[in-house]
Amino acid sequence: MSEITASPRHDWTLAEVEALFALPFMELVFQAANVHRAHFDPSEIQLSQLLSVKTGGCAENCGYCSQSAHFKTGLKADKLMAADDVVAKARAARDGGAQRFCMGAAWRELKDRDLPKLTEMIGEVKALGLETCATLGMLTADQAKALKAAGLDYYNHNLDTGPDYYKDVVTTRTYQERLDTLAHVRDAGMSTCCGGIVGMGEQRRDRAGLLHQLATLPAHPDSLPINGLVPISGTPLGDKVLSEGKAIDAIEFVRTIAVARIVCPKSMVRLSAGREGMSRELQALCFMAGANSIFVGGKLLTTPLPGQDEDSQLFQDLDLKPMGGAVRVEAKADAAMVAAE
């Protein structure tokens, strides 16, 4: 394996990424922390909120997702929210300390008929002074350009897992289709938000495969969310994890964060779904290993996040501060409810 440096590379081999995972834990975290400090203030954490603007009824069969129409999870499908309601949630998120506001819709792909309403939402949220992000399923090249023109800064489209395990997660969308959407986003001039989920029954080689894919993209993701599976009853992967009682090992989760930081040194590595189930000590280790972004707001889709008081106390105890330093960790009581990327 080549010497670990803080300089971005796009020529990582899968063997090199696997070798990073195999480093002694203390050495891996040390190297990741060094890379992190070369590009970021380790005491600064970015705060984001992600609102579900259209929940449930998705045609995809992603085996972890409560929003899939293929599974009976008790989730009620809703129509696309009105722009005024979305803007009100965004304003509350901004006033509560969020720097980025993400809008998510449970669609396989964006339909042109929904573009006018979405571009209106994006423009009005942008006018609040927030960074804007959306996750709306697959995009065409023209749709990506329209979203960019409306003021969208970031587009989220996760790879979910490594290519070899992907068929065990979803069969209604190909890996290449995900890569194609990311290419449309880049070509339109938007920043990419792309990561995956761990704890779905995959092996370490699959986690390495995911990070290898991300590290060898033409441009590293600007934001790299790492989600820990929150098993939801009624979903195939959730039921499997619940029945077997097997969650990803906490140390292995930190390893994943550390490797992500090393192979994508300038990306914002985000602790996403699953943070509610993490101890304070585990979150601290993740921050030490290079995570520097979290979701706030109390809820991610159908799964909980730590409350405002918990996050405020965690930041105080770890001497952390919101990125930019001008916003509060505490969210107001009416802060927007948020949904998972």
From Swiss-Prot:
Cofactor: [4Fe-4S] cluster; [2Fe-2S] cluster
SMART domains for this protein: BATS, Elp3
Bridged cysteine pairs (disulfide): none
Top class in the EC scheme: transferase
Domain of life: Bacteria
EC number: 2.8.1.6
Reactions mediated catalytically: (4R,5S)-dethiobiotin + (sulfur carrier)-SH + 2 reduced [2Fe-2S]-[ferredoxin] + 2 S-adenosyl-L-methionine = (sulfur carrier)-H + biotin + 2 5'-deoxyadenosine + 2 L-methionine + 2 oxidized [2Fe-2S]-[ferredoxin]
Radical SAM core domain segment(s): 43-266
UniProt cross-references to CDD domains, sorted A to Z: Radical_SAM (cd01335)
Details of cofactor binding: Binds 1 [4Fe-4S] cluster. The cluster is coordinated with 3 cysteines and an exchangeable S-adenosyl-L-methionine. Binds 1 [2Fe-2S] cluster. The cluster is coordinated with 3 cysteines and 1 arginine.
Pathway assigned to this chain's UniProt record: Cofactor biosynthesis; biotin biosynthesis; biotin from 7,8-diaminononanoate: step 2/2
GO function term, MF aspect, one: biotin synthase activity
InterPro entries, per the entry: Aldolase_TIM (IPR013785), BATS_dom (IPR010722), Biotin_synth/BioAB (IPR002684), Biotin_synthase (IPR024177), Elp3/MiaA/NifB-like_rSAM (IPR006638), rSAM (IPR007197)
Subunit structure: Homodimer.
PANTHER family: BIOTIN SYNTHASE, BIOTIN SYNTHASE, MITOCHONDRIAL
Record family assignment: Belongs to the radical SAM superfamily. Biotin synthase family.
Name of the protein in its database record: Biotin synthase
